[in-house]
């Protein structure tokens, strides 16, 4: 039994609050247990230099953790003058995954910037950021179409992400911080709406893990992603 009392295939309680930020084209506050991430999507009429004149858009992401989001205060990276390696890795992960589910040609010469700010961290911040960012992106596209800035919907698919791990010899879904810090294996799965994989990250923390253990984690992750897709659809249809 997990310390939280959850079953091995059980997600933490999840909520998606739509449009908490009034100035962004789209925003979502995602809460997965005690992990809370504010996700927003903002449109700019500029693109990176390598895309100028190609009538093609771009989606990029920025990620950060508020100083009080963990048990010990995190120093602001802006105050230190540079981003840490973890921050760069996660925001690149979010950006490239978001680009997989949008037709950049249909976006035109525009850039959508996804901002993910971790308010409270209790494991799974990057997967929560991806799941919440899709909702923010969807709302931003809806806003741009309503304003007739976009004539066609460039979104190709839903996207959601979830963590899995091997904890005390058992495959479990959606690790919290205590589980993550003591897991034998830590992995993240990113899925498209049709169930196909977009990205997989997996690391053995103590000993190599078997193919059977990987398949067990994959099955749990796929089931968890299906629940996340259902919740995304429910809140977006009701908006």
Curated annotation (Swiss-Prot):
EC number: 2.7.7.56
Keyword tRNA-binding belongs to the record: yes
SUPFAM superfamilies membership: Ribonuclease PH domain 2-like, Ribosomal protein S5 domain 2-like
One family name in Pfam for this protein: RNase_PH_C
GO molecular function: 3'-5'-RNA exonuclease activity; tRNA binding; tRNA nucleotidyltransferase activity
Entry keywords, A to Z: Nucleotidyltransferase, RNA-binding, rRNA processing, Transferase, tRNA processing, tRNA-binding
Keyword Transcription annotated: no
GO biological process, one term: tRNA processing
Protein origin, superkingdom: Bacteria
Catalytic reaction annotation: tRNA(n+1) + phosphate = tRNA(n) + a ribonucleoside 5'-diphosphate
Residues where phosphate binds: 86, 124-126
Chain's role: Phosphorolytic 3'-5' exoribonuclease that plays an important role in tRNA 3'-end maturation. Removes nucleotide residues following the 3'-CCA terminus of tRNAs; can also add nucleotides to the ends of RNA molecules by using nucleoside diphosphates as substrates, but this may not be physiologically important. Probably plays a role in initiation of 16S rRNA degradation (leading to ribosome degradation) during starvation.
Subunit structure: Homohexameric ring arranged as a trimer of dimers.
HAMAP family per UniProt: RNase_PH
UniProt similarity note: Belongs to the RNase PH family.
Name the UniProt record assigns to this protein: Ribonuclease PH
High-level lineage: Bacteria, Pseudomonadati, Pseudomonadota, Alphaproteobacteria, Rickettsiales
